[in-house]
Regions:
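Active-site regions of metal-assisted phosphoester/phosphodiester hydrolases
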Residues: 20-61, 73, 85, 91-94, ...
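A short beta-strand-loop structural module common to alpha/beta enzyme folds
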Residues: 63-68
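Bacterial N-terminal signal peptides that target proteins for export
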Residues: 1-9
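Bacterial N-terminal signal peptides
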Residues: 8-18
Length: 191
């Protein structure tokens, strides 16, 4: 778990620094994680607003959490597809955590680059908690994974992180490109 101790502050810092202009070297990748809260939670039709925020920070890829896919709650909208369209037709992959109201609920990744491969892994579930997943996409220059860890149990979080570490080591320990993890880790500074 020590590997993940600094992840939330570093992701926050990366997001803050993202607004410091776009004079970055060509090999730089700007990653953003965003808990969408099924969009429309606070503002009706906030897809254009979120897309504009992502453009302003110069995102190359975005990890999204709390997404509905074709549920009755959100009028049958495939939210990841809709926000990817709002970004100008970005590529995307959805990771289904559970069936929900006629559709699915889960996490996703969208990117301006073409996705070459992807997979989703179910994570251990805390007692009485929602199902959780890890969704991984591979691009030509890097690999990015997203998850939404349990918020009800530190033990469940540890079990979920253990699976994430195992899966990522098995698949990418010898990778010649960088591997990133983003998402809602539900972590506090002292966790």
């Amino acid at each position: 778990m020590n590997k993940f101790r600094m992840l939330p502050p570093l992701l926050g810092l990366a997001f803050l620094l993202a607004g410091c202009g776009d004079s970055r070297p060509a090999e730089t990748v700007r990653l953003v994680t965003y808990n969408a809260g099924t969009f429309n939670k606070y503002i009706a039709d906030d897809y254009p607003l979120v897309a504009e925020m992502m453009r302003e920070v110069g995102a190359d890829a975005v990890c999204l959490n709390e997404l509905d896919s074709c549920t009755t709650r959100t009028g049958g909208v495939f939210q990841l597809e809709r926000i990817a369209r709002a970004m100008g037709g970005w590529d995307y992959r959805f990771g289904r955590a559970m069936p929900y109201r006629g559709g699915s609920y889960g996490v996703g990744v969208m990117t301006r680059e073409r996705i070459l491969d992807h997979f989703t892994v179910a994570l251990p579930r805390g007692e009485g908690a929602e199902p959780r997943v890890l969704t991984v996409v591979e691009l030509a220059r890097y690999v990015i994974a997203t998850t939404h860890l349990d918020h009800t149990s530190a033990a469940a979080q540890r079990d979920q992180v253990a699976v994430i570490n195992r899966v990522m080591r098995e698949r990418y320990a010898e990778a010649s490109k960088p591997v990133f993890l983003g998402g809602d880790l539900n972590a506090l500074p002292d966790s």
